[in-house]
Swiss-Prot record:
Subcellular location: Membrane
UniProt keyword terms in alphabetical order: Calcium, Disulfide bond, Glycoprotein, Membrane, Metal-binding, Receptor, Signal-anchor, Transmembrane, Transmembrane helix, Ubl conjugation
Protein modification: Ubiquitinated by a cullin-RING-based BCR (BTB-CUL3-RBX1) E3 ubiquitin-protein ligase complex containing KLHL2.
UniProt-annotated stretches for the region Disordered: 42-81, 162-183
Membrane-spanning residues: 3-23
Alphabetical list of InterPro entries matching this protein: ConA-like_dom_sf, Neuronal_Pentraxin_Related, Pentraxin-related
Single Gene Ontology MF annotation: metal ion binding
Residues listed as glycosylation sites in the UniProt record: N42, N216, N463
Species of provenance: Homo sapiens
Lineage, highest ranks first: Eukaryota, Metazoa, Chordata, Craniata, Vertebrata
Name the record gives this protein: Neuronal pentraxin receptor
């Protein structure tokens, strides 16, 4: 901007000089000369001017008072002092010519004063010089106008840039180097404008990337000043709402997964029940009469012969399990008459005699030794009663109480939906049998109640005077299935025991 100001001042000065020179080159109108006191030189000049021809008079006036007095007087002419002539008109001409090498000097002008062709050449030179000055003035005027247009354009652009600055930059503290108090080319202001323009460009690019294509096609363009704040606030609100919805959906998904798992388990249980009923319908009535008149026989010790109870057990806080057993082991332990496992606990309920150890009752992996003996290879009635309150237990053999105790898995309820296996001990849910812990012999009348039977009830079952079926699991042909070579055969325990 300093350069533009200097250029404008120089142009104005050049224009004024050219106008002055053009005005000075125009001949002035003739006016009568005024008599100057004591002006002998003026009188001589006037007489010389009157006596000389027109062209010569003009040249004399060109040279001025300090020049030649004119041509000598003719012979016989009266003296100037004796007969003074009346004062004639005086002519003056002021010329402004450039001091160029082509311009004739004063001596050359004096030599060519009396020659008409020399004066004509001088006039032509002066006219060409005046025309050059006029063209120069016109060029300067056009350049000044162009500079003014440029200044207006730059001022307009600067105003638009100021209007596009952020509000914080528009009103932050005193402003320096403005139109009124300083140059516009200060480095600080230029850097500030560049930063503002760069910030605006970045925000515009970011908005173009974030706006969806459908909004760009359908929505009307909003003002640039209103887009960033309103759009960013709406985007922040939408982001918060979406995050809350995502978290809610995640919680619902977890809850649905848990509920679906429970529902799947319930459906599987119902399917098991339905399969049992279908199997009952397919098989028709029981092959044994009465339905509990059968036994399960496991002839040899192995890990693949067993019987499985089809009915699932509920949650139990007390139980009594009674059965008829005849062991055919050779003195190396009676094995496992029955085992009940649930998910996460393979030894929920186990009746086991391993090796030369006494018979044991395991509940939730807690052990109690039972004073029972089955080594005579005969039929024996065994009953085990337990309650979760204080972990009380009782063991009966052939209707008589053999032992009792407490603190066996106290306050632990028997978990439901497990698998009940006859003849094998389970290391996992429903499998991984160990041949050394298998039962060898016959099992009959396995019944299960959800409470502890009284000693009188146990005695009535053992001597066949008051037979009683389990209310949780009765001994029925349709509920017991043999696998791996174990066999089911008709057997009336009271008659068979009498015969044995």
């Amino acid at each position: 901007m300093k350069f533009l100001a200097v250029l404008l001042a120089a142009g104005m000065l050049a224009f004024l000089g050219a106008v002055i020179c053009i005005i000075a080159s125009v001949p002035l109108a003739a006016s009568p000369a005024r008599a100057l006191p004591g002006g002998a030189d003026n009188a001589s000049v006037a007489s010389g001017a009157a006596a000389s021809p027109g062209p010569q008079r003009s040249l004399s006036a060109l040279h001025g008072a300090g020049g030649s007095a004119g041509p000598p007087a003719l012979p016989g002419a009266p003296a100037a002092s004796a007969h003074p002539l009346p004062p004639g008109p005086l002519f003056s001409r002021f010329l402004c010519t450039p001091l160029a090498a082509a311009c004739p000097s004063g001596a050359q002008q004096g030599d060519a004063a009396g020659a008409a062709p020399g004066e004509r050449e001088e006039l032509l030179l002066l006219q060409s010089t005046a025309e050059q000055l006029r063209q120069t003035a016109l060029q300067q005027e056009a350049r000044i106008r162009a500079d003014q247009d440029t200044i207006r354009e730059l001022t307009g652009k600067l105003g638009r840039c100021e209007s596009g600055l952020p509000r914080g930059l528009q009103g932050a503290g005193p402003r320096r180097d403005t139109m009124a108090d300083g140059p516009w080319d200060s480095p600080a202001l230029i850097l500030e404008l560049e930063d503002a323009v760069r910030a605006l460009r970045d925000r515009i690019d970011r908005l173009e990337q974030e706006l969806p294509a459908r909004v760009n096609l359908s929505a009307a363009p909003a003002p640039v000043s209103a887009v960033p704040t309103g759009l960013h606030s709406k985007m922040d609100q939408l982001e918060g709402q979406l995050l809350a919805q995502v978290l809610a959906l995640e919680k619902e998904r977890v809850a649905l997964s848990h509920s679906s798992r429970r529902q799947r388990q319930e459906v599987e249980k119902e399917l098991d029940v339905l399969q049992g009923r279908v199997a009952e319908l397919e098989h028709g009535s029981s092959a044994y009469s009465p339905p509990d008149a059968f036994k399960i026989s496991i002839p040899i010790r192995n890990n693949y012969m067993y019987a499985r109870v089809r009915k699932a057990l509920p949650e139990l806080y007390a139980f009594t399990a009674c059965m008829w057993l005849r062991s055919r082991s050779s003195g190396t332990g009676q094995g496992t008459p029955f085992s009940y496992s649930v998910p996460g606990q393979a030894n929920e309920i186990v009746l086991l005699e391993a090796g030369h150890e006494p018979m044991e009752l395991l509940i939730n992996d807690k052990v109690a030794q039972l004073p029972l003996s089955l080594k005579d290879n005969g039929w024996h009635h065994i009953c085990i009663a337990w309650t979760t309150r204080d972990g009380l237990w009782s063991a009966y053999q052939d209707g008589e109480l053999q032992g009792s105790g407490e603190n066996l898995a106290a306050w632990h309820p028997i978990k439901p939906h497990g698998i009940l296996i006859l003849g094998q001990e389970q290391d996992t849910l429903g499998g991984r049998f160990d041949a050394t812990q298998a039962f060898v012999g016959d099992i009959a009348q396995f019944n299960l109640w959800d409470h502890a039977l009284t000693p009188a009830q146990v005695l009535g079952i053992a001597n066949c005077t008051a037979p009683l079926l389990g209310n949780v699991l009765p001994w029925e042909d349709k509920l017991v299935e043999a696998f791996g070579g174990a066999t089911k055969a008709a057997f009336d325990v009271c008659k068979g025991r009498a015969k044995a």
